[in-house]
Amino acid sequence: DLSQIFGASKDISRNINSYKIIINKSTVPVTTGDEVEKILLKKNKKKLFSVVSNPEFLREGEAIRDFIYPDRVVIGTSEKRPTKILKQLYSPLVSKGAKFLNTSRRAAELIKYASNAFLATKITYINEIANMCEKLNVNVEDVSIGMGLDNRIGGRFLRAGPAYGGSCFPKDTKAILDTASRFKTDLTLIKSVIKSNENRSKLLTKRIIKILNNKLKNKKICFFRSNI
């Protein structure tokens, strides 16, 4: 539902009287920036603005640290003026080691979705390996540690658990599928990831019910180190 973004764009368009940079940091479908620009152009024929995609990459529980010490700063615009201004704005973070990437607006929008879809894929992969480890009587943590020691893979998001969840991964994996569908592209892998994740949740639910002998009434269930 992009009604709030488009509504805010209409409010902005009615009040622009000098050059402004309109920055979108929210996770939005690719081409949202294009639509925002169209709305603004209806009231501003002289184009007193630049629409920029500047996605945030903050983890839950680590938002302040991730903002102060980001891995990268992504600026989505092909215009020189906002690029120069934003590069100066983010220079304190870049001086601390953050990578600065200036790319197209659509690419910046897609980078956010593609990143979250990849992390969801990584979680789903180790969960499937965990299923295999149970059959082989192997400790999945040993396997994930061994894999993570490879610099090409890394150990983050490689811990087996119930399933991925939260406010981002389920929404973003489905959203990137929707974008692919709109542009007639088939993301077979992401479809499989979503299905596997759903199966993982069902599998663990069945195990819990079995352990409790189908007696769930008045039972308290706690997940430790869960990525739900």
Cite the ranges covered by each PLM segment.
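Structural/interface elements that position substrates and couple domains in central-metabolism enzymes
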Residues: 1-228
